[in-house]
Amino acid sequence: IQSLVSSAVYGTPQRSATGFDTKRMNMLLAVLEKKCGFRLGSKDVFLNITGGIKIEDTAIDLAIICSILSSDRDIAIDTQTCFSGEIGLSGEIRAVNRINERISEAEKLGYKQIFISKYNKFSDKGLAIKIITCSKIEEVFKYLFLKN
């Protein structure tokens, strides 16, 4: 997932998504603005799902949010980190289905840590991947971007 966030130069900010529903991206941006206090209203936001695929699974919401915030803050996220969580309208991170399979697959792909909803029930027996549970976007933001 790639995002580019920059100051809007042509008046009305542009919002564009390739491989992801633009309406859902706009909803996620509205949640970041209204419920989480991130100021993106005057910025262009471009989102790209690499590889030419189209993703409709809401479990990608958390990864989309983190990609956008990473670009906005100009702080890279460790490439060995992945995310699986649906974002609700109040900024909460909702549980997703098949979380054990998602965690296992992330580990097989070489990821060292995964952020998931604290409301997911999962088993970490025999896994080396670090599982970080959060209930709100702000918790993930603090963990990724405000640690010293």
Feature roles, as predicted:
Residues 3-148:
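Peripheral, non-AAA+ core regions of ATP-driven protein-machinery
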